[in-house]
């Protein structure tokens, strides 16, 4: 049996998950990362994407996150998300609304740096939309 560790997924609204899991795949800013028990300590940024939680017996659950940070230790992983929801609860209209808000930010950007960051975030959101909600 695979070793487990404590995984917590926290958003500003609530604690979405806190339990023992076998592994978690997170969308790190430097690329996808699989976290398992006894992982080397690291802190990483999280980009918009899907978190896959694998429980004992290979049961899986997925969450959508819209940025944040993960604190990974040998004993566990705490992911503080800017916003998060279960994939099965994701609303196409809500995601489309978020994309339109970011498009407006791109259009209203007053400087190059702000526009570049908004365009990058918009690209991540539209990629996420295509992966999760095919037309």
From Swiss-Prot:
It comes from the Bacteria. Keywords: ATP synthesis, Cell inner membrane, Cell membrane, CF(1), Hydrogen ion transport, Ion transport, Membrane, Transport. It is a peripheral membrane protein. One of its GO terms (cellular component) is proton-transporting ATP synthase complex. Signal peptide: none annotated. One of its GO terms (molecular function) is ATP binding. It is found in: Cell inner membrane. F-type ATPases have 2 components, CF(1) - the catalytic core - and CF(0) - the membrane proton channel. CF(1) has five subunits: alpha(3), beta(3), gamma(1), delta(1), epsilon(1). CF(0) has three main subunits: a, b and c. Produces ATP from ADP in the presence of a proton gradient across the membrane. HAMAP family: ATP_synth_epsil_bac (MF_00530). Belongs to the ATPase epsilon chain family. This is ATP synthase epsilon chain. The lineage of its organism: Bacteria, Pseudomonadati, Pseudomonadota, Alphaproteobacteria, Hyphomicrobiales. The gene is atpC.
């Amino acid at each position: 049996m695979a070793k487990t560790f404590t995984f917590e997924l926290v958003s500003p609204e609530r604690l979405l998950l806190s339990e023992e899991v076998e592994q978690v795949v997170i969308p790190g800013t430097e690329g996808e990362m699989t976290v398992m028990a006894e992982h080397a300590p690291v802190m990483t940024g999280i980009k918009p994407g899907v978190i896959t939680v694998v429980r004992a017996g290979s049961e899986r659950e997925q969450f959508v996150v819209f940025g944040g940070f993960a604190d990974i230790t040998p004993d566990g992983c705490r992911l503080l998300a800017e916003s998060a929801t279960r994939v099965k609860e994701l609303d196409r209209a809500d995601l489309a609304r978020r994309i339109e808000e970011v498009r407006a930010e791109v259009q209203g950007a007053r400087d190059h740096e702000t526009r570049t960051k908004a365009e990058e975030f918009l690209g991540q959101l539209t990629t996420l939309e295509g992966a999760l909600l095919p037309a």
